[in-house]
Amino acid sequence: MEFNGDRIPYLRDTWRDANMICGILPINPSSSGLWPSPKLPDPQANIEFWNYMFPHVQIIFLIVTILWQFFHFFLRRLGMIRFTSHMLTGILLSKSFLKENTPARKFLSTEDYKETLFGLVGACSYMMFWFLMGVKMDLSLIRSTGRKAVAIGLSSVLLSITVCALIFFLILRDVGTKKGEPVMSFFEIIFIYLIQCLSSFPVIGNLLFELRLQNSELGRLAMSSAVISDFSTSILSAVLVFLKELKDDKSRLGSVFIGDVIVGNRPMKRAGTVVLFVCFAIYIFRPLMFFIIKRTPSGRPVKKFYIYAIIILVFGSAILADWCKQSIFIGPFILGLAVPHGPPLGSAILQKFESVVFGTFLPFFVATSAEEIDTSILQSWIDLKSIVILVSVSFIVKFALTTLPAFLYGMPAKDCIALSLIMSFKGIFEFGAYGYAYQRGTIRPVTFTVLSLYILLNSAVIPPLLKRIYDPSRMYAGYEKRNMLHMKPNSELRILSCIYKTDDIRPMINLLEATCPSRENPVATYVLHLMELVGQANPVLISHRLQTRKSENMSYNSENVVVSFEQFHNDFFGSVFVSTYTALSVPKMMHGDICMLALNNTTSLIILPFHQTWSADGSAIVSDSLMIRQLNKSVLDLSPCSVGIFVYRSSNGRRTIKETAANFSSYQVCMLFLGGKDDREALSLAKRMARDSRITITVVSLISSEQRANQATDWDRMLDLELLRDVKSNVLAGADIVFSEEVVNDANQTSQLLKSIANEYDLFIVGREKGRKSVFTEGLEEWSEFEELGIIGDLLTSQDLNCQASVLVIQQQQQMI
């Protein structure tokens, strides 16, 4: 390359010296572009733009993003998670595939800036990942952890490490030797065992999140066990690092005074610094976080100054951890734990940094770290054999010692195996730990390569295997019939009422009043307030009956729900039992909380608010949540009991039951009966409502001319007629039920009938009857907009009918074991 010295004034006089080597300073990190401007001369103009630092980094970012997205597009269909795609991207760009001195290797290599820019970005990504995972983690999970989780967590880690060490010293001592000389150091072996026996909470949480098992009973148990595992292993690893520093340090304890040890011994200084930092996080940093929360007005965002100040402390803690010879993530993770999870502070930090860290920088960190994987060095069978044996033994021991306590606590065999697979899963923490150890010289290059390939294999096999072994929907299926049709007379009706927003409270209470609660026919209402999980990793289910007075002040904005339903309980004292819960979860997993609570409390009916709400005059839709709609559909598919979707309309003078009683009128309810199990379930609820003197029930039975002329022959129709006979007998006995039979021969006549009665009632009750073919609805399914409401329910809520009444759509229990 020829340089023109006249373009650089301070090199003009020395440029012609043949013995002088000149460089261009300062180095320009950015190019002048593909088409540089002649008005802005660049002394490095002869260098290709991609050889500049910043364009090179941007190209690597782009290639990594394209590759891992490409891999994940196909691998997710096989049940694999994103981390596997990140690893494959890194291996594809590593020395194993891109050989030295090839054009592709020179173009895609990060070695030129490995110790500067790429290393800095990777380190920042990794420590920010751990800080955010610390913010997500709820330490109260440890206090509420049961004996089962403690036993599994300790057994899978501490007991596994102990057993592995005994096996090594008693049986496998000669495995890591070559001609009598040790191939692997003692600390290398212990480090491998320690990492292999660990179950990292962030890794387990990410696996469960991507497999949508976070809300399952197995997922909660796995996360609780992982928390116990994390803390026990963190303490153990810190002790091991301290002992290694003592060994490597030139100064010895000997027979010196304790004061000399503390002052003169570097490992002791560092250990003391770690203890002081933990005390700082607990007694200074965490109170400051609560001070920030106190200074933030309710409903207002946290000031950016506070967030950036916290991030500066996070970077400082990483530097301190590195000085103390600890992993750089230890400091940020401790500070993350000290940040109160959830809104306003925890959620504000996550909303600001989570997407860029998890979506961009973390894949880049994994891919660039995997660049060091080099399969060409796997030449020695002794090396391979020793590492493979250590990894295999640790996996088998950990798997067995996780399965054993779970089985002893009465878990099914399949669930025990699934839990052991979850606890044995390896991810970004283990890969980062091996990369850090490789850079520090704790493990050899061949060890790093073999362990990295094992992590890739582990992450590629366990998630698909889990999907085949464990079906979370199976646990919601009941062994008994849990519906209103098969309830014993005068038995307690158990209802799970779901609240998505405060606007759902009044309509839900009004509907519960219509179920006729009395001392002879009591109603048990389990109220579940569902809120989106923001600012923490583990889902939370709060029982407000079990809360202390202190925790009631932090009820995640559920005060209105609790107070309103307590008043409902007082209004019907002795007839209504109310138990209120708040569930914090990600939207895709909320159905797990609903189904599990219904299963545990043996409810007969789940009531879900419809995903759309209307204005007061009914002229416009004021909210339309696709998330709530998908949640309702998931509950319909997996529910352990009957389900009702409640479409509330308050317009056109529609009244509540109390308002009708005050005006000496009755609350008008219409039950449309077309036939089928869902209609029979809906009619059972209508019969119960008829016991309330404030409610008038009208049962409109649709019958075709063919059905009227011919006698019923199929079993389903015979069940319909039997239930209708019971309704007619109640009418003859003086019950407040109006029964009418309408002859309808096609869908057009059904539409005309509904249009004629649409505004005569306060509430319609219909069955969903998904997939049931009927002469009454033939052809209408093509025009149905919301299939979760069924054909009749969808028609009643459509704008064409202009119905101003509320609608309750019932689906009978579907899942049975």
Curated annotation (Swiss-Prot):
Source domain of life: Eukaryota
What InterPro entries does the annotation carry?
Answer: Cation/H_exchanger_TM, CPA2_transporter, Na+/solute_symporter_sf
Predominant location of this chain? membrane
Keywords (alphabetical) are: Antiport, Ion transport, Membrane, Potassium, Potassium transport, Transmembrane, Transmembrane helix, Transport
One of the GO biological process terms: proton transmembrane transport
CC terms in the record's Gene Ontology section: membrane
Q: Which family does it belong to?
A: Belongs to the monovalent cation:proton antiporter 2 (CPA2) transporter (TC 2.A.37) family. CHX (TC 2.A.37.4) subfamily.
Q: What does this protein do?
A: May operate as a cation/H(+) antiporter.
Q: What is this protein called?
A: Cation/H(+) antiporter 4
Species of the source: Arabidopsis thaliana
